[in-house]
């Protein structure tokens, strides 16, 4: 077994995600041994992905490997003569991270058969011509339509079903040149009218006018048509990062429902000290439920022990992870309490959380520094590696995207007038982005309560008994 694991380790050093085609890269004995012991899982006959024993039935391994598998399978079967559809290319350009139920690949070598994959996902290789030039996506190695060509050839339905993704991609176009090259080369008057209408919908009349006038100048009968069913509240500006536009559109799309369903805000708190005492009274209950949601085993006695300072990390608690986590939660809770005090005294809630959330995170993990498990530098800044959530189809943003997204989140919080929207969407967006390697759920619930305080709402505990419902709601909003 040790020899087989060594072979797997060599493959993992070479590739970010191990996808194997039969015995091409590993001997049959090693393959069989790794498969029998849970270190590999079969995706389809003759194709395997790396896993860990005990993860059978857990979708995380598959969702983590999904796009790597698609890219390698297509490259082996089709060479470079393939690409995703225009619609699915736009999904990826827009920063949509949800694993789709069906992937459609276009290729002159396509056989028009649907191949079942793991966990109710499927792959269709459709016989079709592909663009003269395809874009090689750097993260997974996928072949995509070039952005401008994908917008031109997207289905009309895409602009209605995937409004956020479509508008995000439109906002990534600086001028009309690349769009016009595609339209002029293929003489697509109907598509020209649709894409011109799409640009006008997001507030970019300059590109819309340029498309219409240029194509008419070439002799095409262009009739502009808006493919969307609604209008964004504010015009979208050119933005290189898709995540900036995507987050703003998601916020706009979700906020009205929060306002509709949430009770009216109590308003400004006059008795600041009284409110803070009520927060203190919630500590034990909040710590128990918040940590239990994350899977830690903490008792009321342990929570009280770390609260009163009867905690000796250098002695009996040094190897007790639950005690370290509980102490960190207490320290972070006190930091959040300080932020709430500033908010109640008049500081803008978004600005307060922007300034203080690194301190919350630092305090959450300082006990691990105290006992030497973590280094101080580990607590500085956002994550630098990819993180995955067990179970959900949603894959958190990549590290570069996190740095694009977090300033947008705090800008949205700063400028959002309704405290309930700040609370609900602030919490959801924080978890959606997942800016840290660990502790995102706890941090998200701290954001929730800091923003609730800004509207005079009471500190709210998410009970562990409703964990499944809570997680399902977060997942539903993410996909």
Language model regions located:
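Conserved two-metal-ion catalytic palm core of "right-hand" nucleic acid polymerases
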Residues: 47
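FIC/Doc superfamily catalytic core
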Residues: 1-29, 35-43, 51, 55-479
């Amino acid at each position: 077994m040790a020899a087989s694991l060594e072979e797997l380790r060599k493959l993992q050093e070479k590739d970010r995600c191990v996808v194997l085609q039969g015995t091409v890269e590993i001997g049959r004995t090693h393959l069989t041994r790794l498969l029998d012991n849970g270190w590999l899982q079969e995706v389809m006959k003759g194709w395997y992905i790396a896993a860990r024993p005990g993860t059978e039935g857990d979708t995380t391994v598959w969702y983590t490997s999904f796009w790597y598998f698609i890219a390698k399978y297509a490259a082996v079967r089709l060479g470079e003569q393939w690409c995703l559809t225009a619609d699915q290319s736009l999904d990826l350009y827009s920063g949509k991270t949800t694993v789709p139920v069906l992937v459609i690949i276009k290729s002159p070598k396509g056989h028009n058969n649907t191949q079942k994959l793991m966990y109710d996902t499927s792959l269709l290789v459709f016989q079709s011509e592909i663009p003269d030039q395809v874009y090689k996506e750097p993260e997974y190695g996928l072949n995509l339509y070039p952005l401008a060509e994908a917008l031109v050839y997207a289905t009309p339905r895409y602009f209605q079903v995937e409004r956020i993704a479509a508008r995000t991609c439109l906002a990534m176009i600086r001028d009309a040149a690349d769009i016009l090259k595609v339209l002029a080369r293929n003489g697509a008057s109907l598509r020209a009218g649709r894409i011109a209408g799409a640009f006008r919908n997001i507030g970019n009349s300059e590109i819309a006018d340029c498309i219409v006038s240029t194509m008419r100048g070439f002799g095409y009968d262009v009739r502009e048509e808006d493919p969307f069913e609604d209008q964004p509240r504010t015009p979208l500006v050119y933005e290189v990062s898709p995540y900036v536009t995507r987050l703003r559109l998601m916020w706009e799309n979700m906020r009205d429902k929060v306002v509709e369903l949430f009770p009216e805000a109590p308003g400004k708190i006059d008795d600041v000290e009284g409110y803070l005492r009520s927060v203190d009274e919630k500590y034990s209950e909040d710590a128990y439920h918040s940590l239990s949601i994350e899977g830690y085993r903490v008792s009321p006695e342990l929570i009280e022990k770390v609260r009163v300072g009867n905690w000796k990390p250098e002695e009996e608690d040094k190897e007790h992870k639950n005690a370290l986590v509980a102490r960190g939660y207490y320290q972070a809770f006190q930091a959040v309490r300080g932020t709430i005090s500033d908010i109640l005294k008049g500081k803008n809630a978004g600005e307060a959380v922007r300034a203080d959330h690194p301190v919350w995170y630092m305090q959450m993990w300082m006990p691990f520094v105290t006992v030497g498990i973590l280094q101080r530098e580990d607590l500085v800044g956002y994550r630098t590696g990819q993180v995955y959530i067990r179970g959900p189809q949603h894959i958190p943003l990549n590290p570069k995207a996190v740095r694009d997204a977090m300033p947008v989140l705090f800008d949205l919080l700063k400028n959002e007038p309704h405290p309930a929207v700040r609370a609900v969407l602030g919490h959801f967006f924080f978890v959606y982005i997942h800016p840290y390697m660990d502790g995102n759920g706890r941090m998200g619930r701290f954001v929730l309560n800091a923003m609730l305080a800004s509207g005079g709402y009471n500190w709210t505990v998410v009970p562990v008994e409703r964990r499944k419902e809570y997680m399902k709601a977060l997942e539903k909003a993410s996909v």
